[in-house]
Regions:
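Structural alpha/beta surface segment adjacent to cysteine/selenocysteine redox centers
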Residues: 66-153, 226, 231-234
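N-terminal targeting signals for export/organelle localization
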Residues: 2-50, 224-243
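General secretory precursor processing signal
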Residues: 58, 79-82, 204
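A short beta-strand-turn-helix
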Residues: 46-68
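The N-terminal extracellular segments of secreted preproproteins, especially immediately downstream
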Residues: 4, 54, 75-78, 94, ...
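A generic local structural motif
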Residues: 53-57, 84, 177-179
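Extracellular/mature segments of secreted proteins
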Residues: 46, 62-65, 85-87, 209-211
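C-terminal cap of thioredoxin/glutaredoxin-like
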Residues: 25, 71, 150-243
């Protein structure tokens, strides 16, 4: 009898956990669908709101560039920059625009520093990002101050030059992003592809290609692509393999 009771209790725990997981997935799917329909109801206008912003490699976007927004916090361990740099290098017709949604004072400080460094050296700024972002396989990113000192050397600038940029263009960019993302970006990283928000999606360069293709097809009214977009975002939100 005791053995049967333990088996029943074990079954009950498993069933409860399974039901809870199904309930969570249903709630996520419902939210993803509502967000997708809202995004699709808005006419996609590439580049609107991104005037004057530079691509990840430092270029200004061409007239027909494929605009990709990457919303991130530099306190987010899933907001690494390496795969995104690879994607930008492999697709010169794309323009990947970093947008900031800092979740803490430390994240704000890092975002401002990144944008200030970009004014002098794209390479130094990207190296700084990679150094200070928390790594999924390591709980200890490089100390902010040490990474910044190295960035001064990489960009061949003085602390005074950096400080001037910090309170000028960098502050304007980060403030504008924070305001634009309020109430729209709820998780990081979030990609915006053809005006569709892919929240909590940590894409590799190859996965980003596939996600962009799905977004393009969804915008043409392809129902299979629209369904798959929803599935990809749901899996991202649930911490599952996306593509």
């Amino acid at each position: 009898m005791k053995t049967l009771s333990l088996i029943f209790l074990f079954w009950l725990v498993i069933t409860t956990d399974s039901s809870a997981a199904e309930t969570d997935r249903f709630a996520v799917e419902k939210d993803v669908t509502a967000t997708f329909l809202k995004d699709m109801s808005v006419t996609y206008r590439p580049g609107v709101g991104l005037e004057g912003r530079r691509c990840l490699d430092g270029r200004l976007p061409g007239k027909d560039a494929e605009m990709i927004e990457f919303w991130a916090s530099l306190e987010c361990s899933y907001c690494g920059i390496r795969e995104l740099v690879k994607a930008q290098q492999e697709h010169p017709d794309w323009c990947v625009v970093v947008r900031h949604i800092p979740a803490s004072p430390e994240g704000l400080r890092k975002a401002l520093s990144f944008e200030a460094l970009r004014k002098f050296s794209t390479s130094a700024a990207l190296t700084f990002w990679d150094a200070v972002i928390p790594k999924k396989d390591s709980p200890m990113p490089r100390p902010y101050e040490g990474a910044l000192i190295q960035a001064y050397a990489d960009a061949a600038i003085s602390e005074a030059d950096f400080s001037a940029a910090l309170t000028g263009d960098a502050a304007d960019i980060v403030d504008a992003d924070t305001e634009a993302g309020r109430g729209i970006i709820s998780s990081t990283p979030t990609y915006v592809l053809r005006g569709i928000r892919f929240g909590s999606c940590d894409f590799t360069a190859k996965q980003l290609e596939r996600a962009l293709d799905l977004a393009r097809r969804a915008r043409t009214g392809d129902p299979d692509a629209a369904r798959e977009v929803g599935e990809v975002i749901t899996r991202g939100r649930m911490g599952e393999k996306m593509l």
